[in-house]
C-alpha cells in the first residue's frame, strides 16, 4: 500500500498551490473567462489544468505554507494575476467606450439592456462592439498569447516572495488612458460625420423653420449612423489587432518591470 508522508503532502502543496493562485487570479479578471456566465467549476478546472501543466517545470521553493510569509506570498501571486487580466481588459473597455460614444451620437444612448457580465445597464451598440472584440480576440489567438505571458511571469518573477516594483503598478494605472484614446480614435470617423450631419440639420432648421427637425433628424441620423457602422466594420478587425498588440506589448513591459532589482 502506497504511503504518503506529511512532508510529501506539503511538498506537493508547495509545488501547485502558489501557481494556482496566480492562474486563478488571471482567469478571474481576464476577458471572456471573467464573465459571470462562465461556471465557476469551469474556471477552477481550467486553472487546475494550466497549473498541473506548468508547475512541474517551475523551480522548487521551500516556502513554509503555514506562516505569515506564506500569506504575503499568496497576496503577491494574486496581485500579479490580477494585473495581467486587468490590463487585458483595457482593450475591451476601449471598444466599449467607442460603442457608447457612437451610440450617443446616433441617438441610441437610451437603448440599453442589462449586461450579463457586470449586471449593469450597457448601451446596445457598446455590447455589440464588445462581442465583436471578443470574437476577434479569439480569432487572433489572444487567449493563447495571454497564457504564454502568464507562463513567462513564472520565469521573470519566480515564486519566492521577492518584493515587487511599485513602478510597474504605477505604469498599469497610467495605461488606463489607452481606454479613452483608442476608444475615441475608433469612434472619431463617425463622430465627425454625424456632427457634420447635425450641423446641416441645424442650418436647415434656420432656413426652413416650418420643417420639424425632430421628426426628420432622428431617423436620418439613425439611418446614416447604421450605414456608417456597416462601412466601418471592415476596419474594426485591423484596429482591434493593433489594439491587442499594443496591450500585449504593455503587458510584456509591466512583467519585465515587476521584479525589484
From Swiss-Prot:
Topology of this chain in the membrane: Multi-pass membrane protein
Residues spanning the membrane: 13-33, 45-65, 66-86, 90-110, 131-151, 184-204, 213-233, 235-255
Record-linked InterPro entries: FliR, T3SS_IM_R
Keywords per UniProt: Bacterial flagellum, Cell inner membrane, Cell membrane, Membrane, Transmembrane, Transmembrane helix
GO cellular component: bacterial-type flagellum; bacterial-type flagellum secretion apparatus; plasma membrane; type III protein secretion system complex
Pfam families: Bac_export_1
Subcellular localization(s) per the UniProt record: Cell inner membrane; Bacterial flagellum basal body
Family: Belongs to the FliR/MopE/SpaR family.
Purpose: Role in flagellar biosynthesis.
Protein name (database record): Flagellar biosynthetic protein FliR
Species this chain originates from: Escherichia coli (strain K12)
Taxonomy of the source species: Bacteria, Pseudomonadati, Pseudomonadota, Gammaproteobacteria, Enterobacterales
Amino acid at each position: 500500500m502506497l504511503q504518503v508522508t506529511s512532508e510529501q503532502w506539503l511538498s506537493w502543496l508547495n509545488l501547485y498551490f502558489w501557481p494556482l493562485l496566480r492562474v486563478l487570479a488571471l482567469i478571474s479578471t481576464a476577458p471572456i473567462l471573467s464573465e459571470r456566465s462562465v461556471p465557476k467549476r469551469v474556471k477552477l478546472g481550467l486553472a487546475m489544468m494550466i497549473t498541473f501543466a506548468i508547475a512541474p517545470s517551475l523551480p522548487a521553493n521551500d516556502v513554509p505554507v503555514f506562516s505569515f510569509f506564506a500569506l504575503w506570498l499568496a497576496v503577491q501571486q494574486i496581485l500579479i494575476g490580477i494585473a495581467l487580466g486587468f490590463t487585458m481588459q483595457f482593450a475591451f473597455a476601449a471598444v466599449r467606450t467607442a460603442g457608447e460614444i457612437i451610440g450617443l451620437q446616433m441617438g441610441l444612448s437610451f437603448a440599453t439592456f442589462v449586461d450579463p457580465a457586470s449586471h449593469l445597464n450597457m448601451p446596445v451598440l457598446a455590447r455589440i462592439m464588445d462581442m465583436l472584440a471578443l470574437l476577434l480576440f479569439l480569432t487572433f489567438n489572444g487567449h493563447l498569447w495571454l497564457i504564454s505571458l502568464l507562463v513567462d511571469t513564472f520565469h521573470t518573477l519566480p515564486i519566492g516572495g521577492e518584493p515587487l516594483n511599485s513602478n510597474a503598478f504605477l505604469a498599469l494605472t497610467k495605461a488606463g488612458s489607452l481606454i479613452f484614446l483608442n476608444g475615441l480614435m475608433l469612434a472619431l470617423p463617425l463622430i465627425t460625420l454625424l456632427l457634420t450631419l447635425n450641423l446641416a440639420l441645424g442650418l436647415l432648421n434656420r432656413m426652413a423653420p416650418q420643417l420639424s427637425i425632430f421628426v426628420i433628424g432622428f431617423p436620418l441620423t439613425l439611418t446614416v449612423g447604421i450605414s456608417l457602422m456597416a462601412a466601418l466594420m471592415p476596419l474594426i478587425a485591423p484596429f482591434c489587432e493593433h489594439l491587442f498588440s499594443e496591450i500585449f506589448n504593455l503587458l510584456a513591459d509591466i512583467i519585465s518591470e515587476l521584479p525589484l532589482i
